[in-house]
Amino acid sequence: SIHLQYLDSSLVPLSKEDYDISDKSVIDKLTDLNPDVVIHAGAVTDSNVVNRNPISAIQTNIIGTAHLAQYCIEHNKRLVYISTDYVYDGVEGNHNETDPVLPYNNYAWTKLGGECSVRLVSNHVIIRTSFGNPKFPYDVAFDNLVTSKDYVDVIAPMILKIVKSDVTGIINVGTQSKTIFEYASQRNTVLPTKLPTPMNFSLNLNRYEQLF
């Protein structure tokens, strides 16, 4: 949300300390704030943390999302939910929005759980995407993991276009298919390494490209 604020000063980032979505009181706080649209990017995203403390992940990623959905339903607000490409199975790649989902890990299962409540909001959009910090944080990167992931400064403007539109439903957001090694090498010097099993989470981006 901070990156989105850099692009549009009318957007107001909300801190976890003041707006803890796992606490139902967040509904009353949002009622007082009265936003035009809710952009939900908050989540427990570290898969290791999710595995170690699944209850916390459930409280934030699933129950917290349900709280935001409840607010948006009760007050007729637009809800923009940042989901993950990992809800797809990662087998053949080029996943489109109507493909069956089979989350890759527990983190992705919690994000799919969040999607379920978001779908009940009449004016909702679910953005399936993947992005990283402006600099790749590791010295090695997988050359057999294919993705449409890009850096947050690339993806954030794409998300903002959706926020300002009247698009609803599910939409994939990313850039051209590449390996994680190729992605990392755009901005860093890294060495290639391999997953035990090759995976392909690349996204079919036709819907986004047709709309924007």
Question: Where are the predicted features?
Answer:
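Mid/C-terminal beta-alpha module of Rossmann-like enzyme folds, strongest
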Residues: 158-204
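N-terminal Rossmann NAD(P)H-binding glycine-rich loop of SDR-like oxidoreductase domains
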Residues: 1-8
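Adenosine-cofactor binding site in Rossmann-like domains, unifying the SAM/SAH pocket
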Residues: 8-29
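Active-site Tyr-X1-5-Lys
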Residues: 102-130
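Active-site "gating" loop of Rossmann-like NAD(P)-dependent oxidoreductase/epimerase domains
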Residues: 44-48, 52-55, 85-104, 135
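NAD(P)-cofactor binding segment of oxidoreductase domains
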Residues: 38, 52-80
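NAD(P)H-binding glycine-rich loop region in Rossmannoid oxidoreductase-like domains
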Residues: 24-60
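Substrate-positioning beta->alpha
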Residues: 136-163, 169
